[in-house]
Amino acid sequence: MAFQKDAKSSAYSSRFQTPFRRRREGKTDYYQRKRLVTQHKAKYNTPKYRLVVRFTNKDIICQIISSTITGDVVLAAAYSHELPRYGITHGLTNWAAAYATGLLIARRTLQKLGLDETYKGVEEVEGEYELTEAVEDGPRPFKVFLDIGLQRTTTGARVFGALKGASDGGLYVPHSENRFPGWDFETEEIDPELLRSYIFGGHVSQYMEELADDDEERFSELFKGYLADDIDADSLEDIYTSAHEAIRADPAFKPTEKKFTKEQYAAESKKYRQTKLSKEERAARVAAKIAALAGQQ
């Protein structure tokens, strides 16, 4: 039987519904977004906030976002590239960095709303499962819902590190403990010690020790930055502990200091930009080339 191409009829074309642009590009799960954005009709103009967590190759992005008819509005944002200010200079995309970034966005948001003294979260981290509860005779905790986008909800994934950091920071994020590292599917219980070790970079310390014993060349290659700053496996927990304290002490955003002003950057870029010649300059350039060729003959 000869191959026959499946032709699209006029009925197919006339009834075809074009998907949303971000669905066509594979960027947005609208089934998920609809449920994260839709607010209860009896709450009228009350925004519904979500904790948006995204990962790049070199950064972790945490944002508190609400949705409006005209577009999404960002209430607060925190990035893992801000962590060097608090003492975390390496491993800015690992699980412990995700926790620290989540803690930073929580404290920054509550400070902006004036709730940082009312809801301090979990100051002594033991790896236990805790939800932020409302205080008596006070405002309710700030409620957000985790938005993971297109990421897979694998048990122990870094996105849940940011969730844990935000929850321990004082935000009310509805969740259960069955996606954190240390969850046992058979006993349906969590191992607090293992979860705590992830929060303070214990998994990195363990890998550093194992790699140093097994393959010293690979160890010196992977942890070159750590070795240059005299950071060993035993000092990681102290670094993260002091960073958490520093984040709680001053979570406010501070813009990075630029090396040059905008005018200096513009002047520098003009050095390498080819300027457009006028008609007279082009004619003079052609005449000079003709004269040079005539001189060679």
From Swiss-Prot:
One GO cellular component term noted in the UniProt record for this chain: cytosol
Annotated GO MF terms: 5S rRNA binding; structural constituent of ribosome
Annotated positions of the Phosphoserine modification: 167, 176, 235
Keyword Glycoprotein carried by entry: no
Record key words, sorted: Cytoplasm, Isopeptide bond, Nucleus, Phosphoprotein, Ribonucleoprotein, Ribosomal protein, RNA-binding, rRNA-binding, Ubl conjugation
Record-linked PANTHER family: LARGE RIBOSOMAL SUBUNIT PROTEIN UL18, RIBOSOMAL PROTEIN L5-RELATED
Subunit structure: Component of the large ribosomal subunit (LSU). Mature yeast ribosomes consist of a small (40S) and a large (60S) subunit. The 40S small subunit contains 1 molecule of ribosomal RNA (18S rRNA) and 33 different proteins (encoded by 57 genes). The large 60S subunit contains 3 rRNA molecules (25S, 5.8S and 5S rRNA) and 46 different proteins (encoded by 81 genes). Component of a hexameric 5S RNP precursor complex, composed of 5S RNA, RRS1, RPF2, RPL5, RPL11A/RPL11B and SYO1; this complex acts as a precursor for ribosome assembly.
Protein name per the record: Large ribosomal subunit protein uL18
Species whose genome carries this gene: Saccharomyces cerevisiae (strain ATCC 204508 / S288c)
Gene: RPL5
